[in-house]
Amino acid sequence: DDCVGAKSFYIHSFQDDYNRVVQGSRTFELVNLQWKYPYHLVNLTRQSGALLIPRGTFHRSKSGEEGSIVINQAKRYDGFDASAEFYPVSASENRELYNVLRNEKPVIHSVKI
C-alpha cells in the first residue's frame, strides 16, 4: 500500500501474466474496468491451476498465512518496454480504480478440492 494507506496495484499494457501457486496459498485482487463485474478476488492453491491476468487489469496479491511460492510466466506483446510496464498505481491517484474498490462488491473465486 502507498504512503497514505491506499491500495497499490500493478497494470500492464503489453503483457499478460500467468500465475501458478506451487506451494501455500495466495489471494489475487483484480480490477478490470472493461469487465461486466470489474472487481474480483481469486484464492489460489496448488490445486487451482494457473490464473490468467490479462493486460489492462489492475492486480495485486497477498500470500496466505503459511506463505506461498508462485511462478509468474509472462506473455509479452509488441510494444513491451520493461521501463514502462512495472510501476505501482495507487487507488488514491486513480479515480476509476478508487470508485470500483469503493462501490463494487468483489466476485470471490475459490477452488475447493
Residue ranges and their predicted role:
Residues 46-59:
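Conserved SET/PR-domain catalytic core that frames the SAM/AdoMet-binding pocket
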Residues 1-46, 62-113:
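Active-site region of the double-stranded beta-helix
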